[in-house]
């Protein structure tokens, strides 16, 4: 649950703004929000950012005379975390950094809140509350090993299987183009994984017992859960069909791996949508897919709903191309197991 509150005070009037919105997972990183209207003399928070050390940079539109900020681990302000406020530029008082005194006070994936008040030299003030999720400063590295991109029937959902190349945390790592039209991407929750583990993301979820295996104590009871891999689940029951697609794994905007595939019977000369074409270009420009982003250089098989495409991960190989991938018919699909 994310909440963003802004209270503005001037010497003659009080204006209160409130904004409330929700999302499905705390693993999503905070986004910049603009809700500023009204008297242009009011102090405005024009931007804020969070870095890998959970330092929060605040940028205001006016020079600030007084600033006070605190960090809390709960929205009710009962768990105060020791923090410091530092001015970032000597020439002007518009940019400040709020930092933790003890970096271990906020772990990867932990929620925390920055609350503060600023005043300019005319007495105009701004009260603000921003919520964040502890940054992933130790991301794991994933490589795609198998994809079943089409849906046949319940409970056989589409899935993407990934091998952990470098141990670390999954928190905030995204899989692009595996969700709905409104929510096309999936974001992993906080979960520490070890090198050599297999991760399976099931695009759909039909069972209440299908739980994300964020640690070893959780065993998912989903119908197609793998006893050989760590299972994670989308919350969808219905998804658009993707016969041709560009799937990307990225962490903080950096592409880790990608797969580009197209249905050989469709004879498409271009990607079916601009979003897929952009994802394909991103995969190519990042250097993980070769030799181009064009659909002609994607994997070309007639992939039926019961089939998958897979490959054997080559150690220290950072680039992928269509020739590395093979079609696995229904009996050869190895969901959650090492590929043959």
Residue positions per predicted region:
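Aromatic sugar-binding surface patches on proteins
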Residues: 90-100, 198
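Solvent-exposed beta-edge/loop recognition patches
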Residues: 103-108, 190, 195-340
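Buried hydrophobic-core signal for structured, non-transmembrane domains
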Residues: 56-58, 158-163, 246-249, 309
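Short alpha-helix capping/helix-loop boundary micro-motifs
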Residues: 182-189
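Short, surface-exposed alpha-helix to beta-strand junction/turn motifs within ectodomains of secreted
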Residues: 61-86
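Short, solvent-exposed loop/turn segments at the edges of extracellular beta-sandwich modules
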Residues: 118-124
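A structural motif detector for short, solvent-exposed N-terminal "entry" segments of globular domains
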Residues: 24-39, 47-51, 124-179, 236-243, ...
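C-terminal motif of bacterial Sec signal peptides marking the signal peptidase cleavage site
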Residues: 19-22
């Amino acid at each position: 649950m994310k909440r963003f509150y802004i209270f503005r005070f001037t010497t003659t009037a009080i204006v209160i703004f409130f904004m409330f919105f929700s999302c499905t997972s705390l693993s999503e990183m905070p986004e910049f929000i603009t809700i500023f209207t009204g008297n242009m003399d009011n102090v405005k928070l024009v931007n804020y950012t969070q870095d890998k050390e959970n330092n929060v940079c605040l940028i205001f539109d006016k020079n600030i005379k007084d600033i006070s900020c605190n960090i809390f681990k709960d929205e009710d302000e009962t768990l105060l975390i020791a923090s410091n406020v530092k001015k970032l530029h000597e020439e002007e008082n518009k940019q400040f950094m709020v930092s933790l005194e003890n970096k271990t006070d906020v772990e990867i994936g932990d929620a925390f809140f920055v609350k503060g008040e600023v005043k300019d030299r005319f007495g105009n003030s701004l009260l603000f509350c921003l919520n964040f999720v502890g940054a992933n400063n130790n991301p794991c590295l994933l490589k795609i090993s198998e994809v079943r991109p089409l849906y046949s029937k319940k409970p056989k959902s589409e899935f993407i299987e990934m091998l952990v190349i470098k141990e670390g945390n999954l928190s905030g790592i995204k899989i692009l183009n595996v969700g709905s039209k409104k929510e096309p991407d999936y974001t992993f929750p906080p979960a520490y994984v070890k090198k050599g583990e297999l991760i399976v993301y099931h695009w759909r979820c039909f069972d209440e017992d299908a739980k994300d295996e964020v640690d070893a104590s959780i065993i998912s009871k989903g119908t197609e859960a793998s006893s050989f891999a760590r299972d994670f689940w989308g919350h969808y029951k219905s998804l658009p069909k993707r016969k041709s697609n560009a799937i990307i794994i990225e962490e903080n905007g950096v592409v880790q791996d990608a797969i580009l595939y197209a249905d050989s019977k469709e004879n498409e000369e271009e990607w079916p949508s601009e979003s897929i074409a952009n994802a394909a270009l991103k995969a190519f420009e990042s250097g993980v897919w070769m030799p181009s982003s064009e659909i002609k250089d994607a994997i070309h098989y007639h992939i039926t709903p019961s089939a998958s495409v897979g490959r054997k991960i080559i150690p220290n190989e950072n680039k992928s191309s269509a020739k590395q991938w093979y079609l696995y018919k229904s009996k050869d699909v190895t969901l959650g197991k090492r590929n043959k």
